[in-house]
Amino acid sequence: MRYFSAIGTVGLLIAIPVSMGLAADAPQPAPPFVVPVAADGVQRATVILDSYSYSPSHLVVQAGKPVELTLTSVTTITPHNFIIKDPAGSLSVEQDVSAGKTVTITFTPVQPGTFPIYCDKRLWPMPSHRDKGMEGKLEVK
C-alpha cells in the first residue's frame, strides 16, 4: 500500500509544476483597441481578417460618431465576412471580404453596449469560421 501512496505523491508533485507551467504559457487576449476619432469626427481603424481571426478583435468606439473600418483579408484562398448584429436592431453590419481583398465600411452605432463581431462563412459540412474562433467584439461607449 505504501508503494502506491508513494507513486501517487510523486505523480502529484510532477503534475502540479507541469500544469502550472502550461497555465503560464496560455495566450492572453489582446487588449481592446480604442478607435481614435479623427479631426473630421470619424472613428477610423483597420481590421485584418486572417485564418479564423480578426486583429484587433476587440474594438472600442463612441456612440453617435461614424465608424469607418478598413477590412483587409490576408488569406489567399478563404473568403471571410464581418458581421455585427444587435438583437435589438440598433446595429446591423454584414460585409463579405474576398481572399486577398480590402473593403471599407462605414456605420454609426447609436446604442451603447457590447456587440459580437463574427464570420459565419463555412464550407459544408465543416464548422463555421466563428466556430473555429473567428469572432471578436465591438464595445460602444
Predicted region positions:
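N-terminal edge beta-strand
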Residues: V35-P66
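Extracytoplasmic entry segments of secretory-pathway proteins
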Residues: M1-T46
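Short beta-strand/loop motifs in extracellular/secreted proteins, especially
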Residues: V67, T78-F82, G113
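Histidine- and aromatic-enriched segments that form or immediately flank copper-ligand environments
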Residues: T72-A99, P125-M134
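Intrinsic-disorder/low-complexity, polar/charged segments enriched in Ser/Thr/Lys/Arg/Asp/Glu/Gln
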Residues: V42-T46, G64-E68, T102-T104, T114, ...
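Non-cytosolic beta-sheet module surface loops
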Residues: L49-S51, L71-T75, P109
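Extracellular/periplasmic metallocenter environments
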Residues: P27-V34, V97-K141
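Beta-strand-rich interaction surfaces with strong enrichment in secreted/lumenal proteins
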Residues: P56-L59, L91-V97, I105-T106
